[in-house]
Amino acid sequence: ENTVVLSSNLVAYVAFQIIRKRFNQFTVFEILSLPKDETTVSEIEFKIVLDRIRDRLKVLEEDKKIILSSDLDLPTEELMNVGIKKVGSSHPTYVLRKNKNGVISTRSMKLLYYYHNKLSSYGLDEYI
């Protein structure tokens, strides 16, 4: 109930879970070992899932189970961009990046997994 959900937590969760669902027959270890070209997500799919998860997080906030940072009130496009910029900002390599064609990619599935974990215990998987 004192967990604060940041935009960086949300975008990491969304990206990792989209990839995980795509490879649902794989173990987490196998997913973490996927080649980079298998770990991309389209901006359109990302935004759809982002909104779905954000809506569910708002319900959890109303139920006093979590606290949402003010970033989560931003319009979808801005929330996505802010979250992507912030996730893993203390690391020398990007965790998530969006290219000019709207493809979201990661350089490190392990870091993405690490940052996604903050939201992994809230039963959000069914909304992916």
Predicted features along the sequence, with ranges:
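Membrane-interfacial terminal anchoring regions of lipid-handling membrane enzymes
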Residues: 1-128
